[in-house]
């Protein structure tokens, strides 16, 4: 996973670029309990499908959340609902898209007030472009 680093936004929320089914066991070993897909199938040739990743998650006992986004439909139609996914009572969430940028911007939009300001700062420390969240919030 060194070529596709995990960016730890909080103790419970991390983002990264495309995940492969072969990485799921390692993600579980790192304490992740939920994998959230923010990438539509077939965005790039050869990327694993959501069904393939869901099967790998099921095999290893992780929840798989489908919330695919493009820049055209960002942030999707259920930001309030997806906010709950970013606040697990136990375990950790890994959200992924092509680079981690959409996932990080989505997480930022689920935060409010001072927490949102802090979320911008955390994402920007990783070099994540936060323009999508800034334009909407």
Task: Describe each PLM feature range.
Residues 97:
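Short cysteine clusters
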Residues 1-93, 105-137:
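Cys-dependent protein tyrosine phosphatase-like superfamily
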């Amino acid at each position: 996973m060194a070529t596709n680093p995990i960016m730890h936004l909080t103790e419970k929320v991390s983002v990264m670029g495309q995940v492969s089914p072969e990485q799921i066991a390692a993600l579980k070993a790192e304490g992740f309990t939920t994998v959230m897909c923010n990438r539509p199938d077939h965005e790039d040739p050869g990327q694993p499908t959501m069904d393939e990743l869901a099967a790998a998650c099921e095999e290893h006992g992780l929840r798989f959340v489908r919330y695919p986004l493009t820049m055209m439909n960002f942030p999707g139609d259920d930001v309030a609902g997806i906010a709950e996914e970013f606040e697990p009572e136990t375990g950790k969430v890994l959200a992924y898209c092509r680079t981690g940028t959409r996932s990080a911007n989505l997480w930022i939009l689920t935060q409010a007030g001072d927490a949102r300001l802090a979320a911008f700062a955390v994402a920007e420390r990783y070099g994540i472009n936060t323009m999508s969240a800034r334009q909407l919030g």
